[in-house]
Amino acid sequence: MRAAVLRSYGDPLAVEEVSDPEPDPDGAVVRVDACGVCRSDWHAWKGHGEWADNRVPTGQVLGHEPAGEVIAVGDRVDRFAVGDPVVVPFSLGDGTCSYCRRGHGNVCADGRALGFGPDAPGAFAERVAVPTADYNLVSRPDWLSARDAAALGCRYMTAYHALAERAGLDGGDWLAVHGCGGVGLSAVQLGSALGATVVAVDVDDGALSRAAAIGADHTVDPGALAGTDDTVPDRLRELRDGGVDVSMDALGIAETCRNSVRSVRPRGTHVQVGLTTDAERGEVSLPTDWMTRWEVSFVGSRGMPPTNYDDLFSLIEASDVDPGALVSRELALSEVSERLAAMGEYDVRGVEVVTEFDR
C-alpha cells in the first residue's frame, strides 16, 4: 500500500510502498478514506518533542486523524465487522489498565499514539491497523461522512475533552480561545454550542473572521494592541469584568500560554492544549504566586478517551456544529509535505484533509 513516511526531519515525506497491515487477533484494519493534517503532525515532522522524550522516530508513517471502513478483523473482535464505518482515535488504550477501566484511555499506562511511534503506524496511508479494536474503534454515525469525521479528528475531540471534561465549561460561562487554527476554531464552535460566550484571540485577520463566522461573540487581535498600554488579558478583562471563566491555549507558545493564564477570573481555569516549540522546549514560566492568590487552575488536556465519542456526536447532532465547515482544502497524499511546511509559516487556514491516496 502507499504511505507517507518520515525519513528525515523537516524534509519531504517519502510516499512509498509499504507492507499491508494485518489485524492482531483483537485488532482490525481500516481502509482510510480521509485523514486530517494536524499541527501535531507538523511537530512530529520537525522532530520536536526530544525534550520530553517524545520525539517521533524516523521511519514512521505519520497521520493520526483517520476515518474510513473496517476491511479486516481479528478472531477476537466482537463489536465490529467488515464494512462498518468508523473513526479511529489517535489515543489508543489497551482497555485493561486502571485508567482505561475508569474511562481515561487517552492516558493509558501502556497506550499507543497513532502515527507517533513504531508500535502504531499512522494513517497517511491507504490502510491502518487498530489494536484492541473493541475498545479503540469508534462507530461512525450515518450522518457523518469520512471527510467530516477526519476534520473532527483530534481537533473537535481534543477541544471537546478540554472544554467539557477537563475545564468543566458550562452554559453562561465566558470562554477565551487563544490561537484559532484547527483546534482553536473547533473550540470556538463547541464553546458556542455548549452555551458559552466565546472570545477568539489570534493575530491573523482571516482566522478571526472565520472564528466570528462560526460562533465567536468577540475577537481580539494582539497585533492591534502593539504600541498601546493594553495587553490581551487587559482587553479580555474589559470584555468580561474580572476575567473569563475558562481560557484555552490552543497554540502552545509562551506568549499565548501566559496570556491565557492571565485572562481568567479568580477561581477560573486555564486549559493547555497546544504543544510547545523549539523555543520553549516544553517549559513556560508562569505567574505562580498570582495563580495561587486567585486560585487559578491550570489543567492539561490530551486528545479524548475513545469511550467518550458518543457524547461529542450527540452534541454535534443536536446543535448547528458542522465539522465540514472548517475543511478548507482536500489533499492528495503527495501534497502532505507541502502543507506541513506551510504550517511552519502559519499559512494554513481551517482544516486540511487528505482524501486522495493514489497520488
Named regions from a protein language model:
Residues 1-65, 126-128, 358-359:
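Short N-terminal strand-loop motif that marks the start
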Residues 21-35, 50-101, 121, 141-143:
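Glycine-rich beta-strand-centered segment in the early N-terminal region that forms part
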Residues 85, 142-225:
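Mid-domain Rossmann-like dinucleotide-binding core that forms the NAD(H)/NADP(H) cofactor-binding site
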Residues 85, 174, 268-269, 297:
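Short glycine-centered segments of the SAM/dcSAM-binding site in methyltransferase folds
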Residues 94-178:
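NAD(P)H dinucleotide-binding glycine-rich loop of Rossmann-like/cofactor-binding domains
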Residues 175, 271, 321-327, 338-359:
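C-terminal capping/lid region of NAD(P)-dependent oxidoreductase domains
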Residues 230-233, 237, 241, 279-329, ...:
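C-terminal substrate-binding/catalytic core of Rossmann-like NAD(P)-dependent dehydrogenases/reductases
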Residues 264-265:
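Helix-to-beta-strand junctions that scaffold the AdoMet/dcAdoMet cofactor pocket
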